Curated annotation (Swiss-Prot):
It comes from Pongo abelii. Pfam families: Cobalamin_bind (PF01122). This is Transcobalamin-2. It is found in: Secreted. InterPro entries: Cbl-bd_prot (IPR002157), Cobalamin_Transport (IPR051588). One of its GO terms (biological process) is cobalt ion transport. Cob(II)alamin binds at residues 104, 152-156, 190-194, 242, 245, 291, 395-397.
Length: 427
């Protein structure tokens, strides 16, 4: 009888484990190497380069940057509050070149929670009001019949709701309704995995905070819908959508237990795929690295409801400098076929150059022009050969033959003989 009881207890434990998404420990040296990639970014303290996501996710990781971390938060507060509050009721933006977007404001609010702060006082109320106005504007753009689109994206819409929820600020039911409608199975459009994951995190925060009680049943159903969508999006290799949407998807799945072994199995498979991608050097972009670090520490944005600011974290040390090797010259073909006349040119650059380096060299050679805009994930193209991307258009990067690139112009490094195409596409 005692053995039967022990067996039933063991089966119960295994069953409970199967219901949750757990990521087994990853080699600490690999995690530290990832964190070291962020240190140079933390020296970039201009408003254009400040990235609240770096601070948030470092605080949720097992790593710390000491005084560099403190200076970064101070610079965030100085830059964001002066820029956003200084221009809140004025047309004069002063030194605010590249004023933070509302998505960046939402991330800034997450950064405050990561430091165990709530927005308070007159300044805090203004920031909250700005974010609420942004959500109201997006709600109107979507329309009463839901046939419109947000000016930014449903990703930023969900991020805005999440940020307010983490600061215990309620949003109107009608604002939540737009995100619920977009993610419900009968009338949802095509939303990326990271958009679904961000919406799922927002819904999870609302549910755990007991906000919008009149929508509780729909919120619970939406969490289930998002979980099903993400699990169905798992690739044969194990990624959810693609390698770069997997960390945020895992953040959501870690907050969303379900009966049976499917969830646990899917998360273990994703861990194997992520580990392979890490070893291949796929994570070089600061934003992508920062979203991965909390997952490797078994943390999510939902932990910011009750953040632990006293948890021990390992001090990051700068990576040892490597002796530069003599670099060979490679040839990369750059082409733009979606414009008339088409452009096609072979460009010689150093091995290890990025697409951005190729674009700069093409511009120096003449006959090619382009413009970029800064974002939290790095620069992106807004104009090529004088043709600016219009509303709901963007300049896509492809590797011949017809393979869309997941990395941006500052991250992807073409190999010798590759052809890179810039294509204007609609979405």
């Amino acid at each position: 009888m005692r053995h039967l009881g022990a067996l039933l207890f063991l089966l119960g434990v295994l069953g409970a484990l199967a219901e949750i998404c757990e990521i087994p420990e990853v080699d600490s040296h690999l995690v530290e190497k990832l964190g070291q990639h962020l240190l140079p970014w933390m020296d970039r303290l201009s408003l254009e380069h400040l990235n609240p996501s770096i601070y948030v996710d470092l605080r949720l990781s097992s790593l710390q940057a000491g005084t560099k971390e403190e200076l970064y938060l101070h610079s965030l507060k100085l830059g964001y509050q002066q820029c956003l509050l200084g221009s809140a009721f004025s047309e004069d933006d002063g030194d605010c070149q590249g004023k933070p977007s509302m998505g960046q404001l939402a991330l800034y609010l997450l950064a405050l929670r990561a430091n165990c702060e709530f927005v308070r006082g007159h300044k805090g109320d203004k920031l909250v009001s700005q974010l609420k106005r942004f959500l109201e504007d997006e709600k109107r753009a979507i329309g009463h019949d839901h046939k419109g689109h947000p000016h930014t994206s449903y990703y930023q819409y969900g991020l805005g709701i999440l940020a307010l929820c983490l600061h215990q600020k309620r949003v109107h039911d009608s604002v939540v309704d737009k995100l619920l409608y977009a993610l419900e199975p009968f009338h949802q459009g095509h939303h990326s995995v990271d958009t679904a994951a961000m919406a799922g995190l927002a819904f999870t925060c609302l549910k755990r905070s007991n906000f919008n009680p009149g929508r509780r049943q729909r919120i619970t159903m939406a969490v289930r819908t998002v979980r099903e969508k993400i699990l169905k999006a798992q690739t044969p290799e194990g990624h959810f959508g693609n390698v770069y949407s997997t960390p945020l998807a895992l953040q959501f799945l870690m907050t969303s237990p379900m009966p049976g072994a499917e969830l646990g199995t899917a998360c273990l498979k994703a861990r194997v795929a992520l580990f392979a991608s890490l070893q291949d050097g796929a994570f070089q972009n600061a934003l992508m690295i920062s979203q991965l670090l909390p997952v490797l520490n078994h943390k999510t944005y939902i932990d910011l409801i009750f953040p632990d600011c006293l948890a021990p974290r390992v001090m990051l040390e700068p990576a040892a400098e490597t002796i530069p090797q003599a670099q060979e010259i490679i040839s990369v073909t750059l082409q733009v076929l979606s414009l008339l006349p088409p452009y096609r040119q072979s460009i010689s650059v150093l091995a290890g150059s990025t697409v951005e380096d190729v674009l700069k060299k093409a511009h120096e050679l003449g006959g090619f022009t382009y413009e970029t805009q800064a974002s939290l994930s790095g620069p992106y193209l807004i104009s090529v050969m004088g043709k600016a991307a219009g509303e709901r258009e963007f300049w896509q990067l492809l590797r011949d033959p017809n393979t869309p690139l997941l990395q941006g112009i500052a991250d992807y490094r073409p190999k010798d003989g590759e052809t890179i195409e810039l294509r204007l596409v609609s979405w």
